[in-house]
Amino acid sequence: MEEILIYMLIKHHYIWDEVYNALRQKEPIDIKDVKDEYIKLCCKYVTVINEKYPLYLHDVLKPPFAIFYVGNIDLFSKQRICIEGNIKAKNLKYLKYLAAQNFVLCFKQNLIDEEGTDLLIKNHLPFVIYTKDLQCILSNDKLLEKIDKKSCCFVSEIHDEKYAKSRGDFYNNRFFYGRGNPIVIFDEDIIVDIQNNCYLLDSKIPIYVIADNSKKYENINNSQMQKINNFNEFKIVFINKN
């Protein structure tokens, strides 16, 4: 059955509704076609019917039929915390603190650069990076040589780069945040974006902003902030009050 799910994803270009309808209508398949596509896979995966499929994804809207990954999928069985923005050396102590509290640190690949990834690797911090294009990870020999696959995981709903760019942010957001996982923001400039991201999820998500100072928050419009459906759980933690 797992092979069939993978085949349907590939056949229907990872479009959730099309895959769902094909399965519901019991679309005819040729087992030879299934096997031909299956052997082309160059990465690991777990499907929605696999016991290692992340539990939190069962509760999101349109849960992924499969996730493709490089690294340790068991990290999803631990408590996660979503980090918005890039990592800089000055934030390392906070990341170490979170890791010491047994949190797995989760990032979006488009928001974390090579320097940030290197900081995670060099300091042996457990992390998950969500990417639209897993092929760029699989083809990065330099990165694969550096990582400890027991303490990290790169994941995507798509393993074929041809379809990665057309993927909408909604799908990536519900995959990244899930339901109830706390969010930490190190870059206060990203706050405008986070409003829309969280509003899509329809769930209570605690959000914490680690800010250098309060100046950038003096002109925030409260009506805008109330777009965050968990407004009362929004907290700003200032490193230096000035």
Question: What residue spans do the PLM features occupy?
Answer:
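Glycine-biased, small-residue-rich flexible motifs in mid-sequence functional cores and linkers
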Residues: 49-242
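Short, small/acidic-rich helices and loops at N termini and domain boundaries
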Residues: 1-50
